[in-house]
């Protein structure tokens, strides 16, 4: 059971496992799970790719900022954020000040494997890739831009590369106990 900090926010690049790990972590801690991308889809009634196409990245990021503001005010949650949510200084501020931020870190090689066939990610659409030689180049640019922002607000960093989901969740639980964020069982 969490003590003072009953809010856990997962950040990191696409393909790091935020949604999958977040669901299991929430279940283990008996907390409610939210995914900011799914919440945007619920609010708009369309998928995030459509929002990206119609409103552009700026419109999408504005929606994302509002959703993160709302969700970070909830109690007893695990929140999986979109990979680009940290681009907004307002969203970063909400995440950093309102809960415990866990940076799920992964390599570009793992991102390539995990996102290869994913059609739901707006940044992986061919129109975005138009300016890049390949997906690796895009992911490298995103990493250069975003990794320092993930590191800036994270309380805990966990690599998801060589571990199963269960193993990563267990690792997070150990770190939460070590940091005094949850009672020892």
UniProtKB/Swiss-Prot annotation:
It comes from the Bacteria. Its EC number is 2.7.1.71. Its cofactor is Mg(2+). Gene3D superfamilies: P-loop containing nucleotide triphosphate hydrolases. ATP binds at residues 15-20, 121. One of its GO terms (biological process) is chorismate biosynthetic process. Substrate binds at residues 37, 61, 83, 146. It catalyses: shikimate + ATP = 3-phosphoshikimate + ADP + H(+). It is an enzyme of class 2 (transferase). Pathway: Metabolic intermediate biosynthesis; chorismate biosynthesis; chorismate from D-erythrose 4-phosphate and phosphoenolpyruvate: step 5/7. Belongs to the shikimate kinase family. Catalyzes the specific phosphorylation of the 3-hydroxyl group of shikimic acid using ATP as a cosubstrate. This is Shikimate kinase. It comes from Blochmanniella floridana. The gene is aroK.
């Amino acid at each position: 059971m969490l003590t003072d900090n009953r809010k856990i926010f997962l950040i990191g690049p696409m393909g790091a496992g935020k949604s999958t790990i977040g669901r299991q972590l929430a279940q283990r801690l008996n907390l409610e799970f939210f995914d900011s991308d799914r919440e945007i889809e619920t609010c708009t009634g369309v998928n995030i790719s459509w929002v990206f196409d119609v409103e552009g990245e700026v419109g999408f990021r504005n929606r994302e900022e509002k959703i993160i503001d709302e969700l970070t005010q909830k109690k007893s949650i695990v929140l999986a954020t979109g990979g680009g949510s940290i681009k907004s200084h307002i969203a970063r501020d909400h995440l950093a000040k309102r809960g415990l931020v866990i940076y799920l870190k992964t390599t570009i090689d793992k991102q390539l494997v995990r996102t290869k066939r994913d059609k739901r990610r707006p940044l992986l659409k061919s129109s975005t890739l138009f300016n890049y030689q390949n997906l690796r180049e895009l992911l490298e640019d995103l990493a250069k831009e975003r990794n320092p922002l993930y590191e800036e607000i994270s309380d805990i960093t966990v690599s998801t590369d060589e571990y199963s989901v269960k193993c990563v969740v267990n690792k997070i639980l150990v770190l939460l106990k070590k940091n005094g964020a949850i009672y020892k069982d």
